[in-house]
């Protein structure tokens, strides 16, 4: 009840992130309604600076997190009281699901190699935790919430398992295709 919940556009967020955290007032929730990926880090920092005396939890996928990576350093510089909860599946999960449906599993521009999140946290001298099992999730996130200032929690989605394909529309039926 005392935190602000910030979400980037991510497969993990939309499958359960929007449904897990109770939102009591309009200022408890920050979300990019235009479905633009990569705004979460900046929104998390802005919320942390604007919401004095309240913790901010910012949920991002690894794709969106690295799109806003330049802002990550600002969190450290400004001492923003934000926990970055990064759901790491090694690529753009929703794009992979769409490509699986429409391109018979051929992936292009959906997988990437980034620096390790642990290494990024170390460079920023920011506390870091890694969740590799759902049984550890609450304990790891609680430890990050106890930090005064920015902290990073990586959730290894490859070890936890894939999410259902909620976003993918069906293939166009022949009744909709014009000759």
Language-model region placement:
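Short gly/pro/ser/thr-enriched loop/turn and capping motifs at secondary-structure boundaries
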Residues: 13-14, 36-38, 65-66, 90-94, ...
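Active-site diphosphate/adenylate-binding microenvironment
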Residues: 1-41, 47-48
């Amino acid at each position: 009840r005392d935190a602000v919940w910030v979400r980037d556009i991510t497969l993990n967020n939309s499958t359960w992130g929007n449904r897990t955290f109770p939102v009591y007032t309009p200022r408890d929730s920050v979300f990019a309604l235009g479905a633009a990926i990569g705004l979460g880090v900046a929104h998390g920092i802005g919320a942390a600076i604007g919401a004095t005396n309240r913790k901010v939890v910012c949920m991002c996928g690894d794709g969106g997190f690295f799109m806003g990576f330049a802002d990550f350093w600002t969190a450290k510089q400004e001492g923003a009281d934000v926990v970055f909860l990064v759901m790491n599946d090694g690529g753009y999960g929703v794009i992979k699901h769409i490509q699986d449906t429409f391109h018979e599993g051929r992936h292009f521009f959906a997988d990437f190699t980034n620096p390790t999140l642990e290494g990024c946290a170390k460079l920023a001298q920011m506390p870091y935790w890694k969740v590799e099992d759902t049984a550890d999730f609450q304990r790891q996130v609680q430890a990050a919430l106890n930090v005064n200032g920015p902290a990073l929690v990586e959730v290894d989605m490859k070890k936890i398992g894939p999410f259902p394909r909620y976003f993918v529309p069906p293939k166009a039926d022949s009744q909709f295709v014009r000759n």
